[in-house]
């Protein structure tokens, strides 16, 4: 691996920093084919496989017209990278803030194999004017 795990994760997040990526396949290239993404730990089951993750993000794009990320802090320990961010979603005519911590685990080849996001789903649901069940349903492909 010529780049550090932190550099790989920063580049991955940068693809989503200002808006939805124009080329989702290129943005998801750092993910291993069998990677998993857990949108809300522990409330939601992980989405397994790059193709399924892409389908979930495409589903989100239909509901969230725009999004961006503000990176607050990054720390790495070996192949594990921790990020503290505030994500923003533009939906129903307004921006909604989503404070979260994400944990990424990379394999020895530098591919992201685990992507877990820890956040308060009730905060997100409230800002979107939804119940927790409605939020969960809206995230399911």
Q: What does each model-found stretch correspond to?
A:
Residues 1-2, 46:
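Alpha-helix initiation/capping motif
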Residues 25-78:
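A solvent-exposed, acidic/Ser-Thr-rich amphipathic alpha-helical stretch
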Residues 4, 55-141:
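A beta-strand edge to alpha-helix "cap/lid" segment located at domain peripheries
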Residues 2-30:
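Short acidic-aromatic low-complexity motifs
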Residues 17, 43, 114:
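Short, flexible active-site loop motifs that bind/organize anionic cofactors or intermediates
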């Amino acid at each position: 691996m010529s780049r550090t795990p932190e550099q790989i994760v920063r580049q991955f997040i940068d693809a989503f920093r200002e808006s939805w990526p124009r080329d989702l396949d290129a943005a998801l290239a750092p993910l291993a084919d069998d990677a998993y993404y857990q949108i809300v730990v522990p409330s939601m089951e992980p989405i397994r496989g790059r193709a399924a993750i892409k389908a979930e993000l495409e589903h989100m794009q239909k509901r969230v017209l725009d999004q961006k990320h503000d990176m607050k802090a990054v720390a790495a320990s070996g192949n594990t990278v921790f990020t503290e961010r505030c994500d923003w979603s533009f939906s129903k005519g307004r921006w909604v803030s989503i404070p979260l911590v994400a944990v990424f685990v990379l394999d020895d080849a530098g591919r992201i194999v685990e992507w877990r996001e820890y956040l308060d789903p009730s905060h997100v649901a409230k800002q979107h004017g939804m119940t927790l069940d409605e939020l969960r349903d809206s995230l399911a492909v």
